[in-house]
Design a protein with these regions (language model features):
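Membrane-interface amphipathic segments in extracytoplasmic regions
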Residues: 1-223
Length: 223
């Protein structure tokens, strides 16, 4: 989503993983020229914006988009950061996101609708997978469930000094579907989204579903 040159950091904004929160904080600590923040007042929710960094024009750009536009010597030295959120919670949160209220109406998320989300929603591998070199220097995952503490660790690693707690923007609850969560989990395991769980387990992120996707060698750090 955004390149921070002074930090030598690329943040990939996976939807519904507190990306607005993290990028808002990173902008404050960027010692060089930060990405341009463009507010989106026409959208539902608070503090919705896009960032323009000269390499991608999309808020939720994937890693391949940056690989295609960045000089190779710059790309291969990057620290790539993303937030890992339980894949089921992430999709459920997307369904109930404030900006989808008109499309959703008063519908409650059921199994059929969840399968529809699985078919059209990108996987983590879609956002982070690479087929060919160059590859970034390292990949760091922040855990959504412990984002404050992981953010503090990342700030320490980047030499940002003492940082405060993260604010929360545009949260959508997943509590209303907790009873059906096991069914959604099984549904996800039946699709390509099952590979998202490997990012939490640190299993190498290999898809096993496509001969085109190959594991890109990287140093993965879990904070």
């Amino acid at each position: 989503m955004a390149y921070f040159p002074g930090l030598n950091l690329l943040f990939i904004h996976v939807p519904k993983t507190a990306g607005n929160t993290v990028t808002s904080e990173l902008i404050q600590y960027e010692p060089a020229q930060p990405p341009t923040k463009i507010l989106l007042p026409g959208m539902d929710g608070l503090n919705r914006f896009e960032l323009k960094d000269g390499f991608s024009e999309k808020k939720h750009a994937n890693l391949r988009a940056y690989q295609a536009t960045m000089p190779a010597d710059l790309f291969k030295e990057l620290t790539v950061v993303f937030v890992y959120r339980n894949p089921v919670d992430r999709l459920v949160s997307f369904f109930y996101s404030p900006h989808r209220s008109a499309e959703r109406g008063d519908r409650v998320l059921g199994l059929r609708e969840f399968f529809h989300l699985l078919r059209r929603h990108p996987t983590l591998d879609d956002y982070l997978g690479l087929d060919t070199p160059p590859f970034p220097r390292q990949l760091i995952s922040l855990r959504f469930r412990s984002l404050d503490s992981d953010w503090t660790l990342l700030a320490s690693r980047l030499g940002l000094g003492q940082v405060g707690s993260l604010p929360q923007y545009n949260a959508s609850s997943v509590q209303g579907v907790r009873k059906t969560w096991p069914i959604f989990w099984l549904a996800m395991l039946a699709t390509r989204h099952r590979l998202d769980f490997a990012y939490r387990l640190g299993c190498g992120f290999q898809t096993g579903l496509s001969s085109r996707r190959r594991l890109w060698p990287r140093k993965r750090l879990r904070l």
